[in-house]
From Swiss-Prot:
EC number from the UniProt entry: 4.1.2.48
Signal peptide (UniProt feature, chain positions): none
Protein name in UniProt: Low specificity L-threonine aldolase
Gene from which this protein is expressed: ltaE
Subunit structure: Homotetramer.
Organism: Pseudomonas aeruginosa (strain ATCC 15692 / DSM 22644 / CIP 104116 / JCM 14847 / LMG 12228 / 1C / PRS 101 / PAO1)
SUPFAM superfamilies named in the record: PLP-dependent transferases (SSF53383)
Cofactors named for this entry: pyridoxal 5'-phosphate
Reaction catalysed by this enzyme: L-threonine = acetaldehyde + glycine; L-allo-threonine = acetaldehyde + glycine
Pfam families reported for this sequence: Beta_elim_lyase
Length: 346
C-alpha cells in the first residue's frame, strides 16, 4: 500500500532504516562504557577502515553542520580562507558555523559548472590576491554529490586534488550524499575519496536511513591532531556514543548504505523519465544522485502545493527540487509525476 505521508522536499523527511534501528536496539542491551570507549564505536570505526581500505582516523558528530565546521576548522587558522562553490552547504545553510568554529576563516566563493568546482575556478580564487591584506587560501571544500545533484568523477577529483597540492591547499569533502555518488558511479568509497586526493571526508548517514549522525574520516591522519578535543569543546562528544556509532555498524556491515542510496537514485531517475515529455518541464541539472531539479511554471508550482506536495524552490524562479529517499515508494513517485503532468496541462 502506498504511503501517502511520503514527500519529496528533503531526504531528511524519511525515517530510520531497519538495519540502523536493529543495531541501536542491540546496542541498548545492558551497559557499555561511555564517551566513545565502547565496542560499538570501535566496530563502526573499523568498518569504515575496511570499507575505505585505509587506516583512517574516524570521529562521529551529531550532524553535518558540526562535522563540516569542525573538519574545516582543523584544516586552517583564523587568518586563512576556504574556497567553496556559491551553492555549497557550508556557505548557504550552516548559519556561519564554519566561520564560527574556525574563529573567523573566510569562505571564498568560486564559480562552478553544473554545481561542480573546477581546477580553473579554484586557481582563479586562490591566486586572485596573495598580499598580506587578504585571507590566505588554505582549504578547498567540495560536496559529493553536489547541492544540485551532480556527481564528481574520480578524474575530476584527481584534477582538483592536483591543483590543491600545487597551491598548498587541503581538500575537504562534504559527503552528506556520498553514498548516492558511490551508487551512481559504481566506484568504491576509496576511489572517490583518498585515492583521488581527498584529505578529509564528512560521510553523511542522516539522509540515507539513519536517525542522526555523521562520520568524519581523516585520510591524512596528521590533520586529525587534537580533533577529539574539538569535538568535545563543540558539544559533539556523546556520553552514550554507542548510539551514534551502532547505526553505522548496522548500515555498513552488509552494504545497506549502498543499496538504499541506489534505490533513492533509481527513484529520482524514474521521476525524471516520467515527466521528460511534459511540455514546459525541463531538467535544470543532470539527474545523477537522488535529486531532481525541474523547471516548472509558477502556477504549476502553486497547484502542486495546493494538492499537498512538499518540495523546495530555492533555486530560482520556476525551479523546484524533489528529493528521493532510501525508502521512497515507487508508486508515490508515479503519483507525483501524474500530478506534475496534470498541473502542467499535459
Amino acid at each position: 500500500m502506498t504511503d501517502h505521508t511520503q514527500q519529496f522536499a528533503s531526504d531528511n523527511y524519511s525515517g530510520i532504516c531497519p538495519e540502523a534501528w536493529a543495531a541501536m536496539a542491540e546496542a541498548n542491551r545492558g551497559h557499555e562504557r561511555a564517551y566513545g570507549d565502547d565496542q560499538w564505536t570501535a566496530r563502526a570505526s573499523d568498518y569504515f577502515r575496511q570499507l575505505f581500505e585505509t587506516d583512517c582516523e574516524v570521529f562521529f558528530a551529531f550532524n553535518g553542520t558540526a562535522a563540516n565546521s569542525l573538519a574545516l576548522a582543523a584544516l586552517c587558522q583564523s587568518y586563512h580562507s576556504v574556497i567553496c562553490s556559491e551553492t555549497a552547504h557550508v556557505e548557504t545553510d550552516e548559519c556561519g558555523a564554519p566561520e564560527f568554529f574556525s574563529n573567523g576563516s573566510k569562505l571564498l566563493l568560486a564559480q562552478t559548472e553544473v554545481g561542480k568546482l573546477t581546477p580553473a575556478s579554484i586557481r582563479d580564487i586562490a591566486l586572485k590576491r596573495q598580499d598580506i591584506h587578504y585571507p590566505k587560501p588554505r582549504v578547498v571544500t567540495l560536496t559529493q554529490a553536489t547541492e544540485v545533484g551532480t556527481v564528481y568523477r574520480p578524474d575530476e577529483l584527481k584534477a582538483i586534488s592536483a591543483t590543491c597540492k600545487e597551491l598548498g591547499l587541503h581538500l575537504h569533502m562534504d559527503g552528506a550524499r556520498f553514498s548516492n555518488a558511490c551508487a551512481f558511479l559504481g566506484c568504491s568509497p576509496a576511489e572517490l575519496s583518498w585515492k583521488a586526493g581527498v584529505d578529509v571526508l564528512c560521510f553523511g548517514g542522516t539522509k540515507n536511513g539513519m536517525a542522526v549522525g555523521e562520520a568524519i574520516l581523516f585520510f591524512n591522519r596528521d590533520l586529525a591532531e587534537d580533533f577529539d578535543y574539538r569535538c568535545k569543546q563543540a558539544g559533539q562528544l556523546a556520553s552514550k556514543m554507542r548510539f551514534l556509532a551502532a547505526p553505522w555498524v548496522g548500515v555498513l556491515q552488509d552494504d545497506a548504505w549502498l543499496r538504499y542510496a541506489d534505490h533513492a537514485n533509481r527513484c529520482a531517475r524514474l521521476l525524471a523519465e516520467l515527466v521528460a515529455d511534459v511540455p514546459g518541464v525541463s531538467l535544470m541539472f543532470p539527474v545523477e544522485a537522488n535529486g531532481v531539479f525541474l523547471q516548472l511554471s509558477e502556477p504549476a508550482i502553486e497547484a502542486l502545493r495546493a494538492r499537498g506536495w512538499r518540495f523546495y524552490t530555492f533555486i530560482g524562479e520556476g525551479g523546484a527540487r524533489f528529493m528521493c529517499s532510501w525508502d521512497t515508494d515507487i508508486e508515490r513517485v508515479r503519483e507525483l509525476a501524474r500530478d506534475i503532468r496534470l498541473v502542467m496541462g499535459a
